[in-house]
C-alpha cells in the first residue's frame, strides 16, 4: 500500500483492517497481568450507527490504542445490548421475530464498527440475548434471591400504556412523568412484582461516591440526589378517629419546629386517609378525583379526625393532602406553616393557624403570616425549649418526646425488575400452589424463551405449552413466571463477563475478574447516571458480598461524552433533518477523517456542532501527512551538532511528544491533535529550506505519525510503512522526548512575544521593506534584580538595593525594582540571559522567513545603548532597519 501516489482511503482502510485482523493485533491473552481495561458502554442493537456512536467509540478506541502503544496489555472488548422492547416492536411491524431482527442488526452494526477501524478483541464478543449469556442473568437472580436481595410483593408500579409494561422509577422522566423509551405519560397500576433490594445498599451507594475521584462530579451529584439520604426524626402522633386512637409516625428534618405544628397531613393513599374516605364523601371525592401530586398548588381536604401534638398536647386537625406522598417519608407529616413554604401555602388557602416557634438570631424579625421563615434560628413560643438554638433544640426534643427517634430516609426505591414483554430474560421462577414461588434449579438454567408469537398483552402469558411445568420442589403441576427481567439487568454486569466470556461454571472467572477489574476507563452518556451506572454499582457490591469479587466498584474512571449536534447547533434528529449518516462520511472521506474530526472538534465531555468544513479540513490534514511521510528520507541520519534551525525543530518535536502524551493521558484528544497539527505545519515550513536536515524532518514526521496513530490508525499505518517502520505502528512504542524540554513553555512565550513585538514595530512604523532586525536581550544585572525581587519578603526595592553588586547600577536598578514591586507577587517567569539568547537564536530562521530580513540576536553589551536600555528580562528590545527610499 505504501507505493500509492494518492490517498485512496477505501483501499488503505480495507487493507489495514485485514492486516490487523490477520495478526490478532487487538487480542488480549487470558494470562495478561492486569491489562488496562478500556470500555465504552455497549450499544443497543438498533442496526444503525449515528455520529454519537462514532464519537463514543472513537474515544475509547483512541485511548485503548494509546495505552497499547505505551506498553500496556489492553482489554478493549465489544458486545451487544440486544434484549428490549424496540426489537419486539420491530419484529411485529415487519412480521418477523425479535431474534432474527436482532441478529441482522448485530451483523450490520459489526460491519459498521469494523469499517471504522475500531480495534476490538472480537474473541470476547458477547450478546445479551444469547442463552449462554442470559443463563447467568437467571443464575444471578436466584443467587440474589437466596441472599435475601430479591423479593416479590404487591406494589403500585409505573405503567406505560404504550409499551404495555412496568417501568422502574429511574425510567420515568421529567416533571411530566413520561416513559423513558416512548415519551408516553406514565400511569400507575397495582401488580405483584419482583424487586431487587437496592435500598439495602443505599448508604454504601451514597458513601462510595466520595471515593470515585475518576468520575465527573455531575454524575456523582445525580446519584447522590437519586439516593437522596435525609437525616431526621420519626415522631409518633396519636390520631383520634371514631373507631379509636392510632399512633401514626411522621418523619421530619425540623423537629425543632414541632411546637408550631398546627395540622397533621396524610397522603391520599395512606390507610387512615382511606378510612376517612369511607366515612366522608368529600374526602372520598378528593382522594379519587381531585388529588394531583404533580399539580402547581397543594390541595387537600379536612377530615373529622384530629391528632395530638406530642410536644404541646394540643388537638390539631388531620387533613388529606396531595403534597404528601406515601413513598416519601412515612406518608404522614406534621405541618408547620410558619416554617415550611408548602405548609404555609396550604394553611393560607384553608384558613389554618400559623404559629411561629423559631425566630432569626439577633435583631432580625420574620413576618410568618406573610411568608414562612425556613432557616434555623432561636426557639420562641416553645415552652421549656424557648431560647435554645435550633440544633440544640433538635437534640433535646428527640431525646424528650416519647417514642421519637433519629431516623434516615432515602429517596431511592427498590429496583422493580418485572417486565410484561417477550424479548427479555425469563425470570427463573415457577409458581406452585403448594410451595409458592420456587427458583428454577441451576441445572435447569437457562430457562429459554419460547418461539415468538404475535399477540397483544404479555406474550409469555400466551405461551401455554411453555408456561405449564412442574414444581422443582414437590413435582406438582406448576406455572412458569411469565414476566421477563428489566433489560438493565443485562447491562449491570456485562463488563465482568468480558474478562472470561466462555466461562461455564459461573457468570465470570472470579480470579480473572479480581485481577482485571475494575474498568480503568468507562465511556458513555450521563443519561445513564441513575439507571445503568447505579445498577452496576449495586450488582458489583452484591457480587462482592457473595465472595465473587474483591472490589466493590465497577468503574474506576468514567468519561461522559457530549453530543454531536447538527450544523445548526441543535440535537440531531429525524424530525429536524439535521442528522449526518456515518456511512456517507466514511464513504466520501474515510473512517480516519470521521474519527479525526469527531475527536479534534472538542474534548470528549463537550458537545460540538457538526461541520462539513471541519470534515474537509481533517481530510486535507491526513492527505498532507501521508504525502510528507512518502517523501521523507527515512534512512537519513544526523551528522554532528545540529544548526540552530534544526535544533529548534528537534526541540519542537520533543515538546510536542511531551504535550501530546499529557493530553492523551487526560483524554484531551482535541489538544493532542492541535499539537500534532502545529508540529506538521512547522515541519512543512522547515522541510522547504535548502539547508533542512533530513534526519530532523524524518524524526518529526515519525513522531507525528505515532502521535496520530490512535486517532487516525489507517493513515498512520500507511505512513509508518512509508517511513520504513517495522511491523504495525499500532504495536510500535509510544514516542518519548529525546531532549530536555522543561523550559519549552518559557522559550515559546519569549519567541511569540518577540515576533509580536517585531510585527507591532513594522506595522506601527509603516516599514514595508525591513533590511535587518536586531533582537537585544536585557543586561545580566536585570536578571539578578528579578531574582532578588522573587526572593524578597515584601520589601522588593530594599532587598534589591541592599545588594552591593546591584547598587552600582543606581537609579536603573531602583527603577526596575520599583516596576517589579508593582507586579508582586506575579513576577515574570523567564529564562536566564543565556537561555533567552539560545532560544531566540534557534528561532532566527522563523523571524527571517516572516519578515524577509536578516535577524541578529545580541546581548545588551553588544548593542547600542539606545536599544539595549529598552530591554527587560523576557522582553527583548527590538530594532528594525529599513531600506532608504
Swiss-Prot record:
UniProt subcellular location: Cytoplasm
Binding-site list for ATP: 574
GO molecular function, one term: aminoacyl-tRNA deacylase activity
GO cellular component: cytoplasm
Coiled coil (residue ranges): none
Reactions accelerated catalytically: tRNA(Leu) + L-leucine + ATP = L-leucyl-tRNA(Leu) + AMP + diphosphate
Region called Disordered, residue ranges: 866-885
EC number assigned by the record: 6.1.1.4
Enzyme class per UniProt: ligase
Entry keyword set: Aminoacyl-tRNA synthetase, ATP-binding, Cytoplasm, Ligase, Nucleotide-binding, Protein biosynthesis
Any Pfam family matching the protein: tRNA-synt_1g
Residue ranges of the motif 'KMSKS' region: 571-575
CDD domains: Anticodon_Ia_Leu_BEm (cd07958), LeuRS_core (cd00812)
Motif 'HIGH' region, residue range(s) on this chain: 43-53
InterPro entries according to UniProt: aa-tRNA-synth_I_CS, aa-tRNA-synth_Ia, Leu-tRNA-ligase, Leu_tRNA-synth_edit, M/V/L/I-tRNA-synth_anticd-bd, Methionyl/Leucyl_tRNA_Synth, Rossmann-like_a/b/a_fold, tRNAsynth_Ia_anticodon-bd
GO terms for biological process, alphabetical: leucyl-tRNA aminoacylation
Family membership: Belongs to the class-I aminoacyl-tRNA synthetase family.
Protein name as catalogued: Leucine--tRNA ligase
Biological classification of the source: Archaea, Methanobacteriati, Methanobacteriota, Stenosarchaea group, Halobacteria
Gene name of the encoded protein: leuS
